[in-house]
Amino acid sequence: MRIYASTKIWHPANLNIGDAATIGPRVRLYNQGRIAIGSRAVISQGAHICASTHDVTDPFFQLMLRPVTIGDDAWIAADSFVGPGVEIGTGAVLGARGAAFRRLDAWTIYGGNPATRLKVRVMNT
């Protein structure tokens, strides 16, 4: 695994990282809730992954932990945002500056804010 020195990790104990994963420069892992990053996954520069939110119906605005899972071989491209409770499927791609607020299917490429499906990711063999 490779984690750049400029990466910000809120709570290291709530972070699981698979073999050969890369966490790029200026990535923010706001992991009050658990964040799991799969093997060979890439989190590119400036991405922000957030595993908590607030209960907007609670008068005290209580914190709610919502774990984030990023599958093996997934890529979260530059300056993207992955929101609380989101699962990024195996091999999925979230394009640059994309914002994921719901589950992204495996081996599918997404882009935009909110992220929308662009096409199936096909690997060269």
Where are the predicted features?
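Flexible, glycine/small-residue-enriched loop-and-beta-strand segment within the central core
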Residues: 5-17, 22-87, 108, 113-114, ...
